[in-house]
């Protein structure tokens, strides 16, 4: 399924387990989403709706696209500021090199790269 990205699945499971659509609601702890790379367009859109209060990112989107050939979709150039102005903290470059190694290993497997525009 093209929508089963880690961020979407994680947010969905957390909301199901906690029985709330708002992970930032009253009396909720400050939930944090930790990802190995900048969220793609779809995952980025889900973050403000989720209620998480911070996002921790390993590698940048352009780096991942270069390594893997993924098309991460149109991302606002100031995506970090867009989240921050909605009260969501953004921390970048956490374990940056380690995050890139994961994508290099994926690329080296020769597995197909899903790209909805080409039907691959």
PLM region descriptions:
Residues 29, 46-120:
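Zinc-dependent deaminase
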Residues 1-17:
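Acidic helix/loop or adjacent segment enriched in Glu/Asp that either coordinates divalent metal
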Residues 1-5, 38, 70, 74:
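Residues at secondary-structure transition points
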Residues 24-38:
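Immediate flanking context of iron-sulfur cluster ligation sites
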Residues 37, 41-44, 49:
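Conserved redox-active cysteine motifs that mediate thiol-disulfide chemistry
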Residues 15-25:
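N-terminal [4Fe-4S]-dependent radical SAM core
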